[in-house]
């Protein structure tokens, strides 16, 4: 037996089988850094049509989590796909750097501002801390393969950004959207500050639920309201509340004019309840012997006075539209400084707006009985006092959804304070924003209804904060009237100039006289701006001013929680400052959860960190998982899920390696064969690749990365792995090295690789770079500067063997493989090359297969394949799952060729080559080698 190894075209490539990504990726990153790859992309695509994806700033505090990674990877995939489509698609990373979380971190080390450290030094430490956090996060984002202008990111602490925020505020004021108000706002006692809607999250809380008796002062008026002559016992209006701590601030009881109310006798007193709530309320009280005396409407109760349950003051019964008979008692305790509806009613009736609770959550000195106590701790004392005064009708506990601070996770209170607001009604901002939402494309489509509902119902935006670390609200107000200084716009621009030079310290360290001359009449506002105003201003501070970008952005892409956050604040700032929406399209992705759908939590031990993933499996595995997951809903990740992703990656890598290994020795300048002269199967491979590329570009343009990933995987495993590459192995390995059949396949492979590497590049950025380095090419451009491959061809419309034809051949081949597997299991054959395949076909299928002539066997990877009419079928033939087709498999008895492993009667025909077939002899000894037309 001779050794024919040297006569075979064995695969060879520098592209390794093992990814070893965790070790290779840092080296590839280092190469990109040295190449200045992002700068080269910008130079190469300068002047092209722009595509701007505006980066929503992550908060500069702590290492990135997997949610951050998903967000940046999705953005990177979209940017890279747009670059492949020929757009100038810059990516400028941004960071949110002011606000409470950074303050808290600095407080841990240095203490509170103004106490153990000066406010000026405190701000310097905050700035230093934020910059350090940015560098930590930046390193992680870069490690994920995300390309961007990392050397010039936009930080909200950049002096120019801070200055442009002030200029944006000036435009908002100039357009008439700013208002000052004394209103109830969500207040965090731990923050010591008001919170915006976006900073409020809801969580379950157990609260006291009490029914309180307000004694009616004038029983005669009450009797008259119920159509009675008189009442011989005391009567009480019953209110139900889950916030006993607000009772010291009670100034009224609200009823609804349209509701019916019942007067009920219980032993020796009367109570008033909404008629529809009588039965369930008495059941709650466990009272069975009550007697309904009379019924009246709410409008007849208004104006009647009641006694406060523990203070010596009287409170009126008033009409309130917000009162319903869905729950409670139908009578509502009203504390104007602790609720929006209460406040509205209080303003309407000129009720006292005395403040009983300080910013730290403790009662003020003017609060009788409870001065200095923390409100939530005072609940028990208040309930006890009500019991002592016989004003407690019922006491219970209730678990309900309650607003909490997004940062501290502690319960909030509504507290009326003087604040600055962007008004939703002045200048019609709400209506304009709602119209802008309609003019924006939202995906998923439910995003539109979600943000519409939020904007429709939201209160005015409280933009003032009582914090140290933030951009100032640099206003001057009259000491008596509290009106804005008449030159406010001019002053703001003056402040902005100073901040652009020296940062926000230029305001905080300045004297008022540096900005105004009338210091005797005007005082400066000491508040800072809501941190959501920082990020919400990014369209004005970045897109509208940076000539490298454009306004509005083509795309915003963030987590689904940003409908109430950045999407909304960006819209409100842009509409109030510029009068147009900041984005054309808004896409959202779901939250990352574990395989059981649970939120990531250290306590559950289910946290998957991006650092662990890229240090073990590699960033490309994380990128592939991100792309493969339908990000419109929750995105499940776990070690098991990532293991499956790694298996998929290996299949893709193996396909790429097989393709590259069969391009050894191929010169694209001299060896390319024209499409019309290729073997027909190679024509199909190129046309099929073109079909897939068209689909892939289409779904990339729709940001459907999971569909892209599915198409790439299907292409590699089914169209290539299970069909084309399986068939051409024989031709690639055994045909004449420089012969037409092999060069034809290499031409097809060359085109396939050039298309495939581009499809992969946005997702598998590191691996695509590695593939590109191992690919024969006629360009020196790095893969990041390439556009979609244009060397693919489609079949002519009149082509006989078109894609439809080959799809039918694939179906027939699948059926043959099914029958081969049956015969393997029956031990008739061990491999397909041992099989003699006879296909019995009806006229239609016969005509299809006949076109392939004696090359049918190569398509079926068998040593012998015969085609016969169906009428000649034998009893041993097996019906295919295709009408008009039967398949018979027998074991071939002819000798095995030691070179190609086909069984052939021609083995030994040539005395010089006794152990190989005549086809192999031809490939070894002749100049042209064998010829192929179809396969």
From Swiss-Prot:
NCBIfam families documented for this protein: ileS
The protein's name in its UniProt record: Isoleucine--tRNA ligase
Record motif 'HIGH' region, residues: 58-68
Protein task: Catalyzes the attachment of isoleucine to tRNA(Ile). As IleRS can inadvertently accommodate and process structurally similar amino acids such as valine, to avoid such errors it has two additional distinct tRNA(Ile)-dependent editing activities. One activity is designated as 'pretransfer' editing and involves the hydrolysis of activated Val-AMP. The other activity is designated 'posttransfer' editing and involves deacylation of mischarged Val-tRNA(Ile).
GO molecular function: aminoacyl-tRNA deacylase activity; ATP binding; isoleucine-tRNA ligase activity; tRNA binding; zinc ion binding
Catalytic activity entry: tRNA(Ile) + L-isoleucine + ATP = L-isoleucyl-tRNA(Ile) + AMP + diphosphate
Cofactor annotation: Zn(2+)
Binding sites annotated in the UniProt record for ATP: 602
InterPro entries, per database record: aa-tRNA-synth_I_CS, aa-tRNA-synth_Ia, Anticodon_Ile_BEm, Ile-tRNA-ligase, Ile-tRNA-ligase_type1, Ile-tRNA_ligase, M/V/L/I-tRNA-synth_anticd-bd, Rossmann-like_a/b/a_fold
UniProt source species: Francisella tularensis subsp. tularensis (strain SCHU S4 / Schu 4)
Alphabetic keyword roster: Aminoacyl-tRNA synthetase, ATP-binding, Cytoplasm, Ligase, Metal-binding, Nucleotide-binding, Protein biosynthesis, Zinc
Domain notes per entry: IleRS has two distinct active sites: one for aminoacylation and one for editing. The misactivated valine is translocated from the active site to the editing site, which sterically excludes the correctly activated isoleucine. The single editing site contains two valyl binding pockets, one specific for each substrate (Val-AMP or Val-tRNA(Ile)).
Assembly with partners or alone: Monomer.
């Amino acid at each position: 037996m001779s050794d024919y190894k040297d006569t075979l075209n064995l695969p060879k490539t520098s592209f390794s089988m093992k990814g070893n990504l965790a070790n290779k990726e840092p080296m590839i990153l280092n190469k990109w850094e040295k190449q200045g790859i992002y700068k080269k992309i910008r130079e190469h695509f300068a002047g092209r049509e722009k595509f701007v994806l505006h980066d929503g700033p992550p908060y500069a505090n702590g290492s990135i989590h997997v949610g951050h990674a998903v967000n940046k990877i999705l953005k990177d995939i979209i940017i890279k796909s747009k670059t492949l489509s020929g757009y100038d698609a810059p990516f400028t990373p941004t960071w949110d750097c002011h606000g409470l979380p950074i303050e808290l971190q600095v407080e841990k080390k240095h203490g509170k501002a103004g106490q153990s450290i000066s406010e000026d030094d405190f701000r310097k430490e905050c700035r230093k801390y934020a910059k350090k956090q940015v560098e930590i996060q930046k390193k992680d984002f870069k490690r994920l393969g995300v390309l961007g202008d990392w050397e010039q990111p936009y930080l909200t602490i950049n002096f120019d950004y801070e200055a442009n925020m002030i200029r944006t505020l000036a435009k908002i004021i100039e357009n008439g959207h700013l208002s000052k108000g004394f209103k109830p706002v969500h207040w965090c006692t731990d923050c010591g500050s008001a919170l915006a809607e976006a900073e409020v999250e809801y969580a379950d809380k157990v609260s006291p639920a009490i029914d309180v008796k307000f004694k009616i002062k004038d029983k005669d008026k009450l009797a008259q309201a119920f159509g009675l002559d008189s009442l011989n016992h005391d009567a009480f209006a019953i209110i139900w509340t889950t916030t006993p701590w607000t009772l010291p601030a009670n100034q009224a009881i609200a009823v609804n004019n349209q509701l019916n109310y019942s007067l009920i006798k219980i032993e020796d007193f009367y109570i008033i309840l909404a008629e529809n709530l009588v039965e369930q309320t008495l059941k709650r009280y466990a009272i069975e012997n009550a007697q309904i005396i009379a019924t009246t409407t709410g409008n007849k109760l208004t104006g009647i006075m009641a006694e406060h349950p523990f203070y010596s003051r009287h409170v009126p019964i008033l009409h309130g539209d917000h009162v319903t008979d869905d729950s409670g008692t139908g009578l509502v305790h009203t504390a104007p400084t602790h609720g929006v509806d209460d406040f509205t009613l209080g303003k309407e009736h000129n009720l006292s707006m005395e403040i009983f609770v300080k910013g730290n959550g403790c009662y003020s000195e003017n609060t009788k009985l409870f001065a200095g106590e923390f409100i939530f701790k005072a609940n028990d004392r208040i309930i006890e006092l009500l019991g002592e005064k016989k004003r407690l009708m019922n006491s219970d506990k209730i678990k309900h959804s309650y607003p909490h601070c997004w940062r501290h996770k502690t319960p909030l209170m509504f507290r009326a304070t003087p604040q600055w607001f962007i008004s939703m009604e002045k200048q019609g901002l709400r209506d304009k924003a709602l119209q802008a939402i309609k003019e924006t494309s939202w995906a998923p489509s439910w995003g539109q209804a979600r943000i519409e509902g939020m904007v429709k119902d939201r209160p005015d935006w409280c933009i003032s904060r009582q914090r140290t670390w933030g951009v100032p609200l640099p206003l001057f107000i009259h000491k008596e009237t509290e009106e804005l200084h008449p030159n406010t716009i001019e002053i703001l621009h003056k402040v902005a100039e100073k901040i652009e030079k020296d940062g926000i310290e230029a305001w905080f360290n300045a004297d008022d006289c540096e900005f105004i001359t009338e210091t005797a009449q005007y005082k400066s506002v000491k508040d800072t701006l809501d941190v959501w105003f920082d990020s919400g201003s990014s369209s004005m501070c970045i897109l509208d001013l940076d000539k490298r970008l454009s306004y509005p952005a083509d795309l915003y892409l963030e987590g689904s929680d940003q409908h109430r956050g950045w999407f909304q604040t960006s819209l409100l700032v842009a509409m109030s400052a510029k009068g147009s929406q900041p984005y054309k399209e808004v896409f959202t992705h779901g939250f990352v959860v574990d395989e059981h759908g649970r939120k990531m939590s250290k306590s559950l031990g289910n946290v998957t960190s991006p650092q662990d993933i890229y240090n073990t499996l590699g960033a490309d595995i994380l990128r592939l998982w991100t792309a493969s997951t339908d990000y419109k809903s929750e995105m499940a990740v776990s070690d098991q899920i990532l293991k499956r992703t790694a298996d998929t990656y290996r299949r893709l890598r193996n396909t790429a390696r097989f393709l590259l290994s069969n391009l050894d020795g191929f010169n694209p300048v001299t060896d390319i064969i024209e499409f019309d002269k290729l073997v027909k199967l190679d024509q199909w491979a190129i046309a099929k690749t073109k079909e897939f590329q068209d689909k892939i570009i289409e779904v990339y343009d729709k940001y459907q990365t999971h569909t892209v990933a599915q198409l790439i995987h299907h292409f590699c495993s089914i169209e290539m792995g299970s069909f084309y590459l399986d068939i051409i192995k024989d031709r690639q390995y055994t045909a004449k090295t420089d012969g037409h059949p092999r060069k034809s396949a290499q031409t097809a492979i060359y085109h396939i690789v050039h298309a495939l590497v581009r499809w992969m590049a946005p997702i598998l950025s590191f691996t695509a770079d590695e593939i590109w380095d191992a690919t024969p090419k006629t360009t020196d451009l790095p893969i990041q500067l390439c556009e979609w491959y244009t060397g693919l061809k489609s079949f002519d419309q009149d082509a006989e063997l078109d894609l439809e034809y080959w799809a039918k051949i694939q179906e027939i081949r699948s059926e043959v493989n099914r029958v081969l597997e049956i015969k393997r299991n029956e031990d008739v054959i061990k491999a397909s090359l041992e099989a003699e395949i006879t296909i019995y076909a009806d006229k239609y299928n016969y005509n299809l297969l006949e076109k392939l002539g004696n090359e049918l066997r190569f398509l079926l990877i068998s040593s012998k394949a015969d085609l016969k009419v169906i009428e000649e079928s034998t009893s041993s033939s097996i019906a295919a799952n295709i009408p008009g087709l039967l398949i018979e498999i027998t074991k071939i008895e002819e000798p095995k060729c030691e070179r190609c492993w086909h069984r052939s009667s021609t083995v030994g025909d040539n005395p010089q080559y006794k152990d190989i077939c005549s086809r192999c002899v031809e490939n070894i000894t002749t100049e042209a080698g064998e010829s192929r037309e179809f396969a």
